[in-house]
Amino acid sequence: VEYIPLTDNEEMYNRIQLGDTFDLLCPSEYMIMKLAAEDLIQPYPESFYDVNVETNYYAQNVSPYIAETFSAPIAESSDHTWADYAAGYMWGTTGFVFNPENANAEDMKTWDAFTNPTYNKKITAKNNVRDSYFSGLGIHYEDELLELKSQLDAGTLSSADYQARLSQMMNDTPPETMDDVEKILKNVKGNIQAFETDEAKNDFIAGRIDVSYQWSGDAVYIMDEVEAESGIACSYVVPEAASNLW
């Protein structure tokens, strides 16, 4: 097996565009959508999901939640499902990992943590289209998202309607929304230490930053390393309004 590490999804995409070929890819879901839409990846054979094949461990053991999620269409206009092109490698949430000695847990419950001057140059954001734009939408729609959540909790909004409206907001791409998100992200850029892909883990562990927007798996790694090195029990919080499931 030849294992080829890549910096991010965009590097993977560019290499494929330049003619590189791979037998198996491990991209994020938004890149799977892009690759499928451009016919740059092939569907799995039906035999991959045959539970009667002894070595099909994924098909036999995948969680019902993931199986149901992957049964949805990969795009509105597509006849293909996520499962046609992808099998789950790992999944989790995105949120803020923070040092409680230097950051307030209440501040981490809101997307405005990115622009909070208390954490000027002590907080990082993700440097990819999905998570960066999602963060901007979180700030843009935070009040509306919290109101939706309040209606759901009060029983005046059904779970299905809540999910539909949540999905609409957090996938919103008309020009006026994108313009607002662009302005928001420019404000974010002025307050954060950096938009980063992987570097924040070491920066956090070394004490150069106090807050980092992270995938939950990397957040656990950071918390374990900081506690092992300094004895500080860091925390991970998902913004109350909404967050990204990956």
Would you name each region that the model predicts?
Residues 6, 26-27, 125, 195, ...:
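Short beta-strand and adjacent tight-turn residues that come in two discontinuous sequence segments
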Residues 1, 129-132, 217-218:
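Glycine-rich beta-alpha junction loops
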Residues 1-38:
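Early extracytoplasmic/lumenal segment of secretory-pathway proteins
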Residues 1-3, 123, 234-236:
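Generic structural signal for residues in well-ordered beta-strands
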Residues 18-26, 40-42, 119-122, 206-214:
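Alpha-to-beta junction loops
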Residues 23-24, 88, 95, 210-211, ...:
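A residue-level structural signature of the nucleotidyltransferase/glycosyltransferase Rossmann-like core
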Residues 190-246:
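Extracytoplasmic/periplasmic substrate-binding proteins
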Residues 30-191, 195-203, 222:
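Extracytoplasmic ligand-binding site segments that recognize negatively charged/polar headgroups
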